[in-house]
Amino acid sequence: MNNSLHSLSSGEGPPVILLHGLFGQGSNLRGVARALESNFTVHCLDLPDHGRSPWLAHASLSSYAERVEDWMTTHDIEAAHVLGHSLGGKVAMELALSRPERINKLVVADVAPVEYPGNHDRIIEALLRVAVRPCSSRGEAQLILEESIDEPGVVAYLMMGLARVGDTYRWRFNVEGLQAAYPALRAAPRPGAVHEGGALFLRGADSNYVLPAYEAEIGRRFPASQVVTIPDAGHWIHIDQAETFQHRVLEFLS
């Protein structure tokens, strides 16, 4: 059995690894990959329990970071630039804090090295309702989500993780496993550790994921970092202001 993470690779040049958010998949970051692939070899990974990657018995930031490092070793990548959004940003921070020699430059998109409250409980409950009830169409699954989630953008994002299996539709991600692991995934990465390497934290001006109160902790854990606010962007910062986001990332990595 192949336990390696699923990946999509493109471009040529120094390696860049892209890590998606909770309930997502590597293809969510293809827009970022296309912007980088003229200068870098870009690898969009499906995190464990997501997309086409294996599911874990016990998920945590450390176990996810270990799987990313294993993938790097398997693909003969000693070190890489790593960019992560949301949960992917936490996994990227965990890897940088635990194995700094594997990170060239770190980019963290709209998340901080802090423990977050359980704001996804409502979403998880909606996902579970789809999981336990075989849906014969995408529309049926979407209606179930819309009963609990009144944000069209969130529903559209989640629907990208729905796949046809035989005559029904199922989630590509491990809903039950992610529900059980949710407290561990909300936790702060590698408490007490410090990463001295270069790091760029990009936050959306309209998002509440990287509050001003978190800047001191970012500076303490990542003393060589800079925090940049992108106007008119929410949590999906790489979509809301794609051109500005891509420019900032290219400028930093180059």
Residue locations for each model-derived region?
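Active-site loop/oxyanion-hole signature of alpha/beta-hydrolase fold enzymes
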Residues: 3, 8, 31-34, 43-84, ...
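Flexible "cap/lid" loop of the alpha/beta hydrolase fold
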Residues: 94-97, 104-135
